């Protein structure tokens, strides 16, 4: 499915390399832009999709104007960009501005090791899984600094909640990925996907043998991104808007962009770790070459990855429309007393399944 893309990219890559070190730098910048620009556009349309889907769930229309609602998110972006950035009188202005950048940067940096198809990855790092854990953990520092620099008790309380929540669920997410690493035998994300390849279709995916870890990772991902029903960090009924309460204009838009970029990232990672990434659910059931336009249906390709991502991204919205916000003590209890013990037990079970041959890599 990606052959036509590689036929265009490979000659372009060789052309840039002809300029020496400058060409390498320009090629790297171009690859970064090829990830960053579609991600920003995806966030805009994701916001529109969220509003339309929640509107449908509430039996109302949702956005209807500004290009029939399609460009509503872009209108909101321009509105925020041209609004004045107001600084609290007692805020630490330098850290106040740096904090949203520290939150946004890891959200984009994590995409460097995310594969979209065979050979379609910015950096095919052998320690990609470890790099992802590091990047997804760094975003909380921006939130903590935002709460502290605002010099507001509501912002500081939201920041402290975020720190405790991220630390609690980061452990469970890390343990869940240890199970994936044991099953795949690699920290490379592309190799993790190929470890789920086989002639049995979706029966070869890690979703079935690692189902408890899949649930833990999915729920922990929702908690990590501070989305409903784990949105006590910015609970409107308690602390107004949490760490973002003093932010306005373009700096507020950076927090908004980071949150939705993280939601899309988690949707990609769940699809890669547990649902075979770009692999087809009927791979091995049908064979033959008909046309590049339809061969991906059984041979796999990036459209399958996007379908899976769309499902999990829509699930975020479904959770928001369906579940009430958990109490803070309930969130902590779920993370420490349920998820962490469950993941530890299932890591041992996964090791036994690999040792006994129940899980076989890439068969």
Curated annotation (Swiss-Prot):
It comes from the Bacteria. It is a multi-pass membrane protein. GO terms for cellular component: plasma membrane. GO terms for molecular function: NADH dehydrogenase activity; oxidoreductase activity, acting on NAD(P)H, quinone or similar compound as acceptor; quinone binding. GO terms for biological process: aerobic respiration. Keywords: Cell inner membrane, Cell membrane, Membrane, NAD, Quinone, Translocase, Transmembrane, Transmembrane helix, Ubiquinone. Its EC number is 7.1.1.-. It is an enzyme of class 7 (translocase). It is found in: Cell inner membrane. The chain crosses the membrane at residues 62-82, 94-114, 127-147, 166-186, 202-222, 239-257, 264-286, 293-313, 339-359. Pfam families: NADHdh (PF00146). It catalyses: a quinone + NADH + 5 H(+)(in) = a quinol + NAD(+) + 4 H(+)(out). Belongs to the complex I subunit 1 family. NDH-1 is composed of 14 different subunits. Subunits NuoA, H, J, K, L, M, N constitute the membrane sector of the complex. NDH-1 shuttles electrons from NADH, via FMN and iron-sulfur (Fe-S) centers, to quinones in the respiratory chain. The immediate electron acceptor for the enzyme in this species is believed to be ubiquinone. Couples the redox reaction to proton translocation (for every two electrons transferred, four hydrogen ions are translocated across the cytoplasmic membrane), and thus conserves the redox energy in a proton gradient. This subunit may bind ubiquinone. This is NADH-quinone oxidoreductase subunit H.
